[in-house]
């Protein structure tokens, strides 16, 4: 009887453990607790202390949601444009129906870094239409014009579709389809190289046992597309590039400076373990650089002593990298005081020369 009692206790403990793992995959106290336990030995590896984070304020959208993620910034003279998406994940449907890009603007005062952003229009720039949801907007300049790319996820004849809109006279043009794939093709990142506009997109897969809940994901490759005309109405596939690093790219942003391609990205590190030996699959903030745009070296340490990092974006000024990043709702107690589901945007700065890269 004693053995049976012990076995029942073990079984009960195992059931409770599985339940906690399942519940901790969603925003809440258990996820916050799991993040704290998993990352306590790894957050200290970052370069910048999280006390240096300036938290940004965004106006409510028309539905009253302040849960902001997927930021993309464009510095235009003394103005900063930001496109970001509400992401109220605590809603019953996960909030995907609200994940549509909105335009915000901040006025840059002297050399101050902007942290307050006002809605330009209280309506989304585009709607999901036939897709399951919109995601991953990216703002950029091309031939003195302002454009927005948005990724549509899961349509009737595609897994990912990239649409393009031009911002003219405070109005957005009707979207046109420029890229369509049956791959993940996540988070388009734009680089202008002479007469070519390169679009980098990330392909990753969830690991086994519903890995995004418990184990994580793996970056399979990054695909590159190029424009075929100046009007940006036609793009062609260029190549896949391998990603052999332990830091797995999830969302990112790119820029070119002084002969190097730079990729700022959030991602887990498969070499990171918890103190009890399990993989730490929470995401940190990284940067990689490349001379040819194909072979990248990744920084040795995360840029900031904080896990729970989501989509980053940045601008470079006087070799100071000004980084904006969304949180991934894993800081339940702290971030939810400000934003319902814990998705908000922070900012910090780091000198580009202070970052060391792996060989």
Regions found by a protein language model. Give the residues of each.
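Transmembrane-helix exit/juxtamembrane "anchor" motif
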Residues: 23-27
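Feature marks short, highly hydrophobic, charge-poor N-terminal signal-anchor/signal peptide-like helices
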Residues: 1-10
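A short mid-domain helix/strand-loop element embedded in enzyme catalytic domains
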Residues: 136
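Alpha-helical transmembrane segments
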Residues: 15-21
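Exposed aromatic-hydrophobic patches
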Residues: 312-313
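N-terminal leader/targeting signatures
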Residues: 9-13, 292
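Beta-rich carbohydrate-recognition and catalytic domains
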Residues: 19, 29-132, 140-250, 255-307, ...
